[in-house]
Amino acid sequence: MQAIISTAPGQAALVHDRPLPTIRDGYLLVKTKAVALNPTDWKHIEVTQKPGILFGCDYAGIVEQVGPGVQSGFQPGDRVAGFVHGGNSKEPQDGAFAEYIVAKADLQIHIPEHMSFEEAATLGVGITAVGQGLYQTLSLPFPSPSSIHEDGAEKPANPATQPILIYGASTASGVLGIQFAKLSGFAPLAVCSPDHFDLAERLGAVAVFDYADGEDAVEEIQDYVRGMGQPLLKAWDTISIPSSARFCGDALSSGNGPQYASLLSMTCPRPDVTSTTTMAYTVFGEDWGMGTAHFPASGVDAELGRRWWALVQQLLNEGRIQTHRIIAGEGGLDGVLGGLQQLRDSQVRGGKLVFRV
């Protein structure tokens, strides 16, 4: 089968003779229909040393076979999507960029009827990042039926409720983060480019701020928070670079234990702010590797992942979560490596690059 794998240190190529993966306990064998690209994909290629490791994390497809021990109600023929662990040196056959893949059942969803393969393929990494960042780390309450009216219409965000800062609000993770924070009863304050203000507001941000305004934007956030009458104690940074960490730290209110959560290893420079970095791959509950580094399994994170994806299934079925804007790539798996170069060169903005397989 076709697959994008490591061929030498820091290099990857599309091959045409990759064997089908072996299905493991708790896993599904899936025929891939679409894949979406993330920065973590090209970063894994850069650090991978061994040949034969499959890349890619986001996909959608059709179940071909259900492995032993699967208790999640999947059957052959089901349309599914979710999160797989591409670039994993401990399990080289895990990954998304192939015609057939294996996917841990606990971290997958049945694709709702109203959703296309391409839309569903955008979810995996972002959904997992939201679960770990907003809920496991920043301790937002899980969305519940109380966040909607009896007639099914969403309640508007209450301007008097507790604010949360989402930096990088137009990224795939940020777009989802706005929506989930709103469903959890928080008031999302979105930081992004002005080109994406309308998107952030449409998804539920109560206010939007231009990251390029720096200190002026920080002052605007502080003024807005004072008007709300609630301190800003939680910030989620989907960009996770020194300037974004500093921005978040400057914007957070003083006292009462302010928290900063990031997707990459980054620390808020303010000493009174608790900084936490999440690594999405811990939700698999298995030992894993990235390049030459190795990481232990986390049973706690695996249980969070299982519970979180079950809730996400319900919210998607109810149509309460919108996917990110799709940027259609060309060439199927043949086009993926070029797409990853586009990501690396910061040529993809305000949407998710998706390839039909």
Curated annotation (Swiss-Prot):
Any GO molecular function: oxidoreductase activity, acting on NAD(P)H
Which InterPro entries is this protein grouped with?
ADH-like_N (IPR013154), GroES-like_sf (IPR011032), NAD(P)-bd_dom_sf (IPR036291), PKS_ER (IPR020843), Trans-enoyl_RdTase-like (IPR047122)
Q: In which pathway does it act?
A: Antifungal biosynthesis
Give the domain of life.
Answer: Eukaryota
Q: From which residue to which does the signal peptide run?
A: none
- Enzyme Commission code(s) on record: 1.-.-.-
UniProt keyword annotations, A-Z: NADP, Nucleotide-binding, Oxidoreductase
Protein transport among keywords: no
Q: What does this protein do?
A: Trans-enoyl reductase; part of the gene cluster that mediates the biosynthesis of the tetrahydropyranyl antifungal agent restricticin that acts as an inhibitor of CYP51 and blocks the ergosterol biosynthesis. The highly reducing polyketide synthase resH, the short chain dehydrogenase resG, the cyclase resF, the FAD-dependent monooxygenase resA and the enoylreductase resD are required to generate the first stable intermediate desmethylrestrictinol.
The protein in question is named Trans-enoyl reductase resD
Q: Which organism is it from?
A: Aspergillus sclerotiorum
Gene, per the UniProt record: resD
